[in-house]
Amino acid sequence: MAKYNVPADVPDELIDTFIDNMNAATAGTGRMNLFACDQKIEHLNDDFYDGGKKIPLSSNDPGHLFEIGNQCHQQGTIGVLAGQLGLIAQYARDYPEIPYLVKLNSKSHLVKTKQRDPVSQALWDMDDVMSLVHNGINVVGIGYTIYIGSEYEHEMMSEAAQLIRQAHELGMISVVWMYPRGAAVGNEKDPQLISGAAGVAACIGADFAKVNYPAEFEGMSLSLIHISE
């Protein structure tokens, strides 16, 4: 098993719980392969239905995500399934072995940046998350999206920071989706900007940062270029 850095806001009596959640989320490697299932809000139906042309009709059933997640978890190819609390609540009892990461905020893609800088506020709080835990759902942590560079970034950072602290106090892990976006952002894939966004995630206490793959940059290794292709 990997050795983890346990944040100081995790109570002493919950350190083992935090480590157990880390092991569950990373299969003991310290590296997370997250199965993101938050697109039902984020992308609406764009990724799930096209009349059967390229997307299988089975993909339009929300339960299909959990079938995939369960199979991949059994194979050891994913650590956690990340989704909104409501979606997890609907299906988790049928798939009790999957470790879940509850995504606390979300927004659709309908309002574009040219109309308004993005903002995504929490739809649930930690009491709601704990209600799932008390009902026997295998929740190991929380997730939150921050649009760094938005004029509303301070609102999202403040909310995320408090939720991360509360999650740690309960022995849970946290993942922050860090996406540069807004009128002030010239290039969302700029490597320096993405690196800075990851640093912001560290500063608000996140255990993991989910970022966009950066544009090619000087010194990029061939292995990374091959992955991007």
Say what each PLM segment does.
Residues 225-229:
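Conserved small/polar residues in nucleotide/adenosyl-binding loops
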Residues 55-158, 173:
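Active-site beta->alpha loop and helix N-cap motifs at the rims of alpha/beta catalytic domains
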Residues 38-42, 84-88, 105-109, 147-149, ...:
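Active-site beta-loop-alpha junctions enriched in small/polar residues
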Residues 15-28, 88-93, 125-133, 159-168:
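Short amphipathic alpha-helices and their capping/turn segments at secondary-structure boundaries
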Residues 1-38, 93-95:
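N-terminal amphipathic alpha-helix/helix-capping segment at the start of soluble metabolic enzymes
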Residues 191-205, 210-211, 215-224:
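A mid-sequence, solvent-exposed acidic-amphipathic segment
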Residues 138-204:
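Conserved anion-binding
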